[in-house]
């Protein structure tokens, strides 16, 4: 059963029907809000540049702020990024889960520059939630950013997202209230010695331990 308010997005409970509708809407260029294992996100189809522009506009995100892509599985990372030894170790250890890996962008990757704020890099994550993975399995890597206005607190549930983002979002997949945890930890693997750019769901000490165990040098505190 769906609900809607004046100027608000439709809300459908997470499940096969909601995911099928989300896929159709994304292919048509709409913006959809989805649950993840960290916070709710809003997503667009990577193949549609106009939709990506609407993604930035929906949350008033400045163009100098990069947007990561959610993946169905670790295999999709190699489509857009160059997966080096450190990234391979971290993906095997922490995906699916709350870690975004920043990788060098593949020269042949079809990726709008705005998603990386003009840098030759790409941020990728496999979330520990079936809804975004199902969408990415069907559509490919999914540009996704947190479902809030830029610089504001994260929306806590589907109704709040629908009210906050209004007509900018066509559908909200309702996965229940968020757990209130942090966003993903961001690890930069484009430098010689990986470094944490944002502390989040996965503590730096655990990341350092994984790299130490693999014999990979890094600049992450906690080892």
Q: Model-derived features: where do they sit?
A:
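Active-site-adjacent structural elements in enzyme catalytic cores
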Residues: 1-223
